[in-house]
Amino acid sequence: MQPLQILSIVALVVAAIIAIVVWSIVFILIRKILRQRKIDRLIDRIRERAEDSGNESEGIRKELSALVEMGHDAPGDIDDL
């Protein structure tokens, strides 16, 4: 074999190794990005649910404060015996 053929074979092998390394890094980064998107979606869903449950509890608080204003200090504690 001539030196040019040997050099071209070595160059192809090196190029293949570099391509494998680069695509492996790309694959790992894509997995990280997709995992982070899933985490972000879960965090958004948790925030939405927390906001929803917070709104419901505010409504309950308003109803309880309205009862207290009507004269019932403790709705569960009635001593009318």
UniProtKB/Swiss-Prot annotation:
Keywords attached to this entry: AIDS, Apoptosis, Host membrane, Host-virus interaction, Inhibition of host innate immune response by virus, Inhibition of host tetherin by virus, Ion channel, Ion transport, Membrane, Phosphoprotein, Transmembrane, Transmembrane helix, Transport, Viral immunoevasion
Residues in compartment: Extracellular: 1-7
One annotated Gene Ontology cellular component of this protein: host cell membrane
Cross-referenced InterPro entries: Vpu, Vpu_cyt_dom_sf
Any one GO molecular function term: monoatomic cation channel activity
Coiled coil is among the record's keywords: no
Mod. after translation: Phosphorylated by host CK2. This phosphorylation is necessary for interaction with human BTRC and degradation of CD4.
Recorded topology in the membrane: Single-pass type I membrane protein
Modification Phosphoserine occurs at: 53, 57
Signal peptide positions (record): none
Activity control note: Ion channel activity is inhibited by hexamethylene amiloride in vitro.
Primary site of residence: host cell
Locations listed in the record: Host membrane
Cytoplasmic face of the membrane: 29-81
Entry keyword annotation includes Cytoplasm: no
Function: Enhances virion budding by targeting host CD4 and Tetherin/BST2 to proteasome degradation. Degradation of CD4 prevents any unwanted premature interactions between viral Env and its host receptor CD4 in the endoplasmic reticulum. Degradation of antiretroviral protein Tetherin/BST2 is important for virion budding, as BST2 tethers new viral particles to the host cell membrane. Mechanistically, Vpu bridges either CD4 or BST2 to BTRC, a substrate recognition subunit of the Skp1/Cullin/F-box protein E3 ubiquitin ligase, induces their ubiquitination and subsequent proteasomal degradation.
Subunit field text: Homopentamer. Interacts with host CD4 and BRTC; these interactions induce proteasomal degradation of CD4. Interacts with host BST2; this interaction leads to the degradation of host BST2. Interacts with host FBXW11. Interacts with host AP1M1; this interaction plays a role in the mistrafficking and subsequent degradation of host BST2. Interacts with host RANBP2; this interaction allows Vpu to down-regulate host BLM sumoylation.
Domain notes: The N-terminus and transmembrane domains are required for self-oligomerization and proper virion budding, whereas the cytoplasmic domain is required for CD4 degradation. The cytoplasmic domain is composed of 2 amphipathic alpha helix that form a U-shape.
Additional free-text comment from the UniProt record: HIV-1 lineages are divided in three main groups, M (for Major), O (for Outlier), and N (for New, or Non-M, Non-O). The vast majority of strains found worldwide belong to the group M. Group O seems to be endemic to and largely confined to Cameroon and neighboring countries in West Central Africa, where these viruses represent a small minority of HIV-1 strains. The group N is represented by a limited number of isolates from Cameroonian persons. The group M is further subdivided in 9 clades or subtypes (A to D, F to H, J and K).
Family assignment from sequence similarity: Belongs to the HIV-1 VPU protein family.
Name of this chain's protein: Protein Vpu
Source organism (scientific name): Human immunodeficiency virus type 1 group M subtype B (isolate SC)
Protein's gene: vpu
